[in-house]
Every structure is written in C-alpha cells, then in structure tokens.
C-alpha cells in the first residue's frame, strides 16, 4: 500500500525485489487517475516508471469508462465484481498480483481474504487527521510480520502475511 510522501527512496525499498515478480497491478480509480497523470511521462530511465508503464494495470471503478483506459498504456477497466475478478486472476498461472494506490480497494481485498501479503509504509509524520486504512467495525485480522526495512528518510516498510492460526 503506497501512502503519503512516497519518494523514489521509498519506492526503491518497497518495490526493488518485487517488480520482477509482479505480473499484474490492481488500482483504484483515484490512484489510477493520479498515476496516469504522472508515470507515462516520468521518464523511462526511472526503474519504477519502466515497470508501471509496461505492466498490465486493472482498474476498479464504478465511474470510469473503458475509453478512459486509453490515457495510460496497458490499462483495462475491471468489468463486474472486483473480488470475482481478483479470484479469477489469482487462479491463472503467473506471478504476483499487486494492489496499489487505493485504500478502499486494499481494504476490500484484504477483508475478502484475497491478499496474501500486506505492505504498509509508515512515515515519520503525525498527521492528526485523515482517512483511516481500517474503519470502525473492521473484523480482527491476525497478521505475521514477514519483513521490515527502514529507508534513509526514516520510513518503515513493513510486510505482513496471513497468520496460520
């Protein structure tokens, strides 16, 4: 899950080893719009730009139209239920599916049991207000820390997996 203040430093730590494994990316509407306005012209010399522009991007939205997907290469609109789409995509042979840039999308997939890992970036900032990743009433979900890395700017990149018990 990518959050505020995402710098090249954080992207490098977060995605350094993952990019080679990811075959598909799932994005929410807002995240796709933001990223579609930046990454296509970011310069292919940036490692993440080359990756995100080339990878198939599946967009979860009730308001975007299939024609909107022309704004960014390799983008397609998820038709129908996103959970069914992700289940079907997971059933196909291939690498990792990454859900990026969409808190409500990540929340939905996690609570549906469709995420095998959850990566959170903790920034050394006290915001005092803003959206919460997990709303009141979210059921308890037990996770196990799989890895943690600190960036040179003090961000913590924490990756959790499903706990076996």
Residue ranges and their predicted role:
Residues 1-114, 124-165:
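Portal/gating segments that form or line small-molecule/metal binding sites
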Residues 117:
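Periplasmic plug
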